[in-house]
Amino acid sequence: MDKNGEIVEKIKDEKSINQNLDFLRNYRDSYNRTPLMVACMLGMENAIDKLVENFDKLEDKDIEGSTALIWAVKNNRLGIAEKLLSKGSNVNTKDFSGKTPLMWSIIFGYSEMSYFLLEHGANVNDRNLEGETPLIVASKYGRSEIVKKLLELGADISARDLTGLTAEASARIFGRQEVIKIFTEVRRA
């Protein structure tokens, strides 16, 4: 059995976790992921409480800088994200590229997750290492409803990334017509 198959067996339920506490305590796979990260990736919601209770590694990072919350978001595991935030995960944590959970939810088009993260305090003006804000990311990917929500919440419409592009300029470059209409309406108001 490969290492990830082995870890899945060891975290599949509370009994398995209890039997393997010593093994799980310091376990990392070849990508430096903890058992909690693997559970978040695979949607093993029943394992989350027990893993957090025993190991409290909410902010540990893998080789890309992703935390358990970022893995839950990347895999659209809303229930798990909710559980992690209730246990103290940082809604504004960043991976090594500077992307936050909100940025990842926008990139993947997980609107419900994006709204959830915003309701739980995600920073609308945070920046990744390219200088992009969530508004620039949403504009670039054509996420018009999220663009509207970010503007409602006070996202900086004039923010520029490291190349000098604003959210509106990004929308134009990527041909995001719905987003361009939103910025046109904002200018008219």
Curated annotation (Swiss-Prot):
Source organism, top-level taxon: Archaea
Organism: Thermoplasma volcanium (strain ATCC 51530 / DSM 4299 / JCM 9571 / NBRC 15438 / GSS1)
ANK repeat boundaries on the chain: 31-60, 64-93, 97-126, 130-159
Name this polypeptide is given: Putative ankyrin repeat protein TV1425
Residues annotated as transmembrane: none
Keywords for the protein's UniProt record, in alphabetical order: ANK repeat, Repeat
InterPro entries: Ankyrin_rpt (IPR002110), Ankyrin_rpt-contain_sf (IPR036770)
